[in-house]
């Protein structure tokens, strides 16, 4: 219930005109945030699909020691999109604001990979983006009119980027054949009838591309996915990352590397990406800004005195834009600010 209230409140707040923040709206938003609540999006769990949001899959075939590579675009290059161009058509039911959020997700791929989402111009194979029930997609290019659903509760940047990455050709990170070396599944905490959502995909069907397991992947389940009691269903083997998995707001550095490998993208940078599992977890701590360092002629100030109290939400996916708009000083979103540093 709390997740739904938070979601509704976020949607309301995010549409407020930024030039004149509403004290009532902000206080309403802030009042719903408990001190220890880690916000996650579970709308995709309600789609009734394989692993919550994957459409067009027979789970039994995926678990066979040998089977048709048809179901995994990573293993079968024939199921990738030619030239990295993904044609799409969009449901007319989407609002202008929803379209804007969707286009921003497209842009995440354009800026970091050779993937291009382009409006369909008669192509046979294309994405049909609809306002269906729940959030779900198919993996890779399955042929013809291919549905991707972004229903109620799905219009968050990170959710859309996640679903689009399925379409690009990727499974969930937790379903990797080598996942037991990196995470522990707490089977007793999983909802009845939902244990199959944590099945591994056979190595025969899945190409790991020689890349490390990525706790920070946009494709990772969060720690309480399909939980029957609010306790962790997934815990990381490496200390400090249980609260990191499933909280990505965008493509991780390794997500980008994997996409560019799959599509043989020509990248401008030759830098080697540091494996996500060797980094220290980010600490969600209040950020301090020197007002004198602001380059803009305008003063960068918080709009409410309570902002420092909610500093931990500056980097939470669900509240990022709200906090940026209402608490720019606390959240270090002033012109000229240095990037958020990790503690320690």
Curated annotation (Swiss-Prot):
Q: Quick check: keyword Transport in the entry?
A: no
Tissues where this protein is expressed: Expressed in pharyngeal and body wall muscles, intestine, hypodermis and pharyngeal mc2 cells.
Give the knockout phenotype: 10 percent of animals are arrested at the larval stage. Defects in the grinder of the pharynx result in reduced pharyngeal pumping rates and a slower growth. In a nas-7 (hd116) mutant background, growth is further reduced.
Which residues belong to any copy of the ShKT domain? 300-334
Position of the signal peptide: 1-19
Q: What PANTHER family is this protein classified in?
A: DISCOIDIN, CUB, EGF, LAMININ , AND ZINC METALLOPROTEASE DOMAIN CONTAINING, ZINC METALLOPROTEINASE NAS-6
Q: Can you name this protein?
A: Zinc metalloproteinase nas-6
Species of origin reads Caenorhabditis elegans
């Amino acid at each position: 219930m709390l997740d739904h209230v938070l979601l509704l409140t976020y949607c309301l707040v995010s549409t407020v005109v930024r030039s004149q923040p509403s004290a009532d709206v902000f206080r309403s938003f802030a009042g719903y945030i408990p001190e220890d609540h880690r916000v996650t999006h579970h709308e995709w769990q309600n789609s009734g699909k394989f692993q919550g949001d994957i459409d067009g899959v027979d789970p039994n075939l995926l678990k066979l020691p040998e089977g048709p590579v048809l179901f995994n675009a990573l293993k079968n290059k024939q199921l990738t999109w030619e030239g990295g161009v993904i044609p799409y058509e969009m449901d007319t039911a989407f609002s202008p604001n929803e379209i804007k959020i969707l286009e921003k997700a497209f842009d995440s791929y354009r800026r970091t990979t050779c993937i291009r989402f382009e409006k369909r111009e008669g192509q046979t194979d294309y994405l049909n983006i609809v306002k269906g029930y729940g959030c779900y997609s198919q993996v890779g290019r399955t042929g013809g009119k291919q549905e991707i659903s972004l229903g109620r509760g799905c219009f968050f940047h990170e959710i859309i980027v996640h679903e689009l990455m399925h379409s690009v050709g990727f499974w969930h990170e937790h379903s990797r054949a080598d996942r037991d070396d990196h995470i522990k599944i707490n089977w007793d905490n999983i909802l009845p009838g939902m244990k199959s959502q944590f099945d591994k995909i056979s190595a025969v069907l899945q190409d790991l591309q020689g890349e490390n397991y990525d706790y920070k992947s946009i494709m990772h389940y969060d720690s309480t996915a399909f939980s029957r009691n609010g306790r962790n269903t997934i815990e990381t083997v490496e200390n400090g990352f249980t609260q990191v998995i499933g909280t990505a707001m965008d493509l991780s550095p390794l997500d980008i590397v994997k996409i560019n490998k799959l599509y043989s993208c020509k990248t401008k940078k030759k830098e080697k990406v540091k494996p996500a599992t060797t980094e220290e977890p980010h600490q969600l701590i209040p950020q301090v800004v020197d007002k004198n360092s602001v380059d803009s002629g305008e003063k960068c100030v918080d709009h409410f005195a309570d902002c420092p109290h909610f500093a931990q939400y500056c980097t939470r996916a669900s509240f990022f834009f709200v906090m940026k708009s209402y608490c720019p000083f606390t959240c270090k979103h002033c012109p000229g600010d240095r990037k958020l540093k990790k503690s320690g």
